[in-house]
Amino acid sequence: MSTTVRPDEVSSILRKQLANFESEADVYDVGTVLQVGDGIARVYGLTKVAAGELLEFPNNVMGMALNLEEDNVGAVLFGESTMVKEGDTVKRSGILASIPVGEAMLGRVINPLGEPIDGKGPIDAKLRLPLERRAPGVIYRKSVHEPLQTGLKAIDAMIPVGRGQRELIIGDRQTGKTAVALDTIINQKGKGVFCIYVAIGLKGSTIAQVVSTLEKYDALSYTTVIAATASDPAPLQFIAPFAGATLGEYFRDTGRHALVIYDDLSKQAVSYRQVSLLLRRPPGREAYPGDVFYLHSRLLERAAKITDDVEVAKKMNDLPDALKPLVKGGGSLTALPIIETQAGDVSAYIPTNVISITDGQIFLESNLFNSGQRPAINVGISVSRVGGAAQIKAMKKIAGTLRLDLAQFRELEAFSKFGSDLDKTTKAQLDRGARLVEILKQGQYVPMPVEKQVAIIFVGTQGLLDSVDLKFIRKCEEEFLAMLEMKHADILSGIAEKGTLEADVASKLKDIATKFIATFKEKNKA
């Protein structure tokens, strides 16, 4: 019995088979690793890759394209270079280096790629923003006019920092630079300022200590720590500050206030130099690449006070689409970069670069630190280019005489070492200066509210402490402020609310201080 095959049956079977056949083809742009080592990989074949784009290497190692050359791409690796070998396939990710942002990041310790490293589980952040972004143009900015209180008397009185300012903290190692930054973070409690602490090239133990300090003083709830430790690859250390700026910009552009601390940019410059030399970029002064100034300027220019006009703010240059619906005006991003000097040499390459970019510097000196003056701020070299605009009126009023008195004291102190016979006026100026220096001393992690600062500096500049023995000044200050808080809280709250020191309040404060000091001297007779 023969079976006949009908052509129409065959064609209908084929049609059914073809209808059920689905071809799934994923198209990837791939390249091949030509050479790898020291955290750098040279990749052949990625002809359409963008500068700053993330690349996927085998074994879950991520990289970033930095050098786009004629025949290959120079990429930096964010993982161990031993995990990547010659001939490996590299995939383009199609996305530029970015980081998750949002309130979910607060209270967490993350690496510069936004991955949590504190063991508290994954972060539920809906939004991702690119690490690199152009700074807001002039039209979208507003001049700095609100104070960002650090809680340190010497800074808030003489080197005030405003919201949206860039103020450099510079000094040798072990002079208390990080302590100043941490005090500033602790002082933002309840002030609606979100803080980002970027640790670049620090020891893991140091970062753990910083985190435990922030936890101890209830400051971690409004702070994010971005950590690139000394053992992390150089590329991670170099991108860490940009991650901090991006996170701060999210708060700034949504109409809130943020403070970002870069600790420290000297180590970032060193890691950038390492990456650049490995990528065979031509070296310049001190072997840094020619664009090391641009590295820091494009980072620090992102700190700004944004205009109050929402419509103008929404047109901000380089604003990511995902962020546009959330934009509000009036936000600010304040930057406190830290630079470590060698033997007090402020005129080295990186320190001079960053000094010229920032709106002032707080210079910490090891001699002052070792002599017991802490914070060890050299008031002569330190400056804030925003000045009185970043102070409340009461502080502005009394701080002018403070700076002058201290300058005269330093000058006379140098001369007094040569001769012992001093006239009455000179001796009085020296005595007052010594007491003012004593007033400006402050313990670590005890930031002082601005109204208390105003009260004690007013008492000092009025000469009311001149008759108090120098060794009792700190004790007198503590007891006086405690007494004010207990019996005359209205004066302190008045200064805090109005921001001014009216003539009647000033005379009342003077009377209270005079009576208190008289009884204090009686009580503490030697």
UniProtKB/Swiss-Prot annotation:
The gene is atpA. HAMAP family: ATP_synth_alpha_bact. It comes from the Bacteria. It is found in: Cell inner membrane. SUPFAM superfamilies: C-terminal domain of alpha and beta subunits of F1 ATP synthase, N-terminal domain of alpha and beta subunits of F1 ATP synthase, P-loop containing nucleoside triphosphate hydrolases. GO terms for molecular function: ADP binding; ATP binding; proton-transporting ATP synthase activity, rotational mechanism. This is ATP synthase subunit alpha. Signal peptide: none annotated. Its main location: membrane.
